[in-house]
A protein has these predicted regions:
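Beta-propeller-forming repeat regions
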Residues: 1-191
Length: 191
């Protein structure tokens, strides 16, 4: 629960990588994205988060044997896999914070199907009843976060955020994948 009650909220990234928060519903997602918004939509971010290089091409199947299936390379037929959105009770107050990655692109988000993520940031947000408020964010991390999870990877009884990073070397097409872990400690608030 984002607010400490037992009322659940649906937190997701939309097709433009904006965070959306909904009241639980049995409606299909396509029915929630209507002109003017739906009554279930509680909040939508102005900024983009997530960002993924993980994609698949849709395959055309017209009742043909598998050997005759065609890969449709039309850019509109590319589906990007959204990064997960994690919730975690950072300060043990019974309220889950939203922890999300923002992959930063060297070319911005001008072209929808052109992604060149070179760095990233991790954000921690808290639900204040009307929207998400930023608690903290990391400094810029060199590399693209392909996935992330919260786990106690060093068995010290404290959870860490574990990143699967893809790091590019400048002036080269070579890439290296690494796992990085950050302690999840609540920063002291400056008064």
């Amino acid at each position: 629960s984002l607010d400490g009650s037992n009322r659940l909220k649906l937190v997701m990234l939309d097709e433009y990588d904006r965070i959306r928060i909904y009241e639980p519903t049995l409606k299909r997602f396509i029915d929630l994205d209507i002109l003017g918004g739906s009554e279930e939509l509680l909040w939508k971010s102005d900024d983009h988060y997530g960002g993924s290089n993980n994609a698949f091409l849709r395959i055309t199947y017209a009742g043909q044997p598998m050997s005759d299936w065609a890969i449709d390379d039309n850019p509109d037929k590319v589906s990007y896999v959204k990064l997960r959105v994690l919730t975690y009770d950072m300060n043990k107050n019974g309220k889950n914070d939203v922890i999300i990655v923002k992959n930063l692109s060297a070319v911005g988000r001008i072209m929808r199907n052109l992604t060149l993520y070179t760095s990233s940031e991790i954000y921690d947000f808290e639900w204040d009843g009307i929207g998400l408020s930023e608690n903290w964010k990391t400094k810029k991390i060199q590399g693209y976060v392909a996935d992330y999870q919260i786990k106690d990877i060093d068995n010290d009884g404290e959870d860490e955020v574990v990143l699967s990073l893809v790091v590019s070397f400048s002036g080269s097409l070579r890439k290296k994948s690494i796992l990085a872990a950050y302690d999840l400690t609540v920063p002291e608030r400056v008064q």
